[in-house]
Amino acid sequence: VLGLPDLYETTNTGYHKTLGQWSILDYGPYNNDGNTPPSYSAYERFFMGWLTPRLITEPENVVLEDLKNNNEALLISSTDEHNLIGNDPNPTACYMLENRQQTGWDEYLPGHGLMLTKIQYSSNNWKQNTVNNSSNRMGVDLIEADGKKPNSRQNGYDGKPGDLFPAGATEYLGIADHSIEEIS
């Protein structure tokens, strides 16, 4: 769609967890029996040049409004700098933080709150449409708030309310003391 890569596993050889219902480029088009796909995520908008996230380099208190109403997101980089170019990022590893609420196109998401996505960009994987084919190095990976990362989609996993950080969950977002590679 529009030059975006698929975010589900495209080889169908393994059944590891991808973004599921949270992304229109994965299982999201099937939300509400296929009638109500979700809004594009912050990363998808960033990749297309429709959103420029605010780079966070120091600890701070932030009010992040609903993505679909305000088109705003935060980017946490592995360094204090980032070129903010979604389809050619430098550095290639970063996090996107967005607020998803169950209204409008997002009404049929499995839950609401702050969605934290880890990005590990590889131009080859994006060009070959193999972004999330390796469970060992996902290109776009949801960081589950409850810490419960399913290891398989074979049992019908496509998203759950505990995937997103609830409002006021500041104690969960202490990622500043860790490198990008350490957080999963």
Describe the residue ranges of each PLM region.
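The catalytic-center signature of Zn2+-dependent metalloproteases
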Residues: 1-50
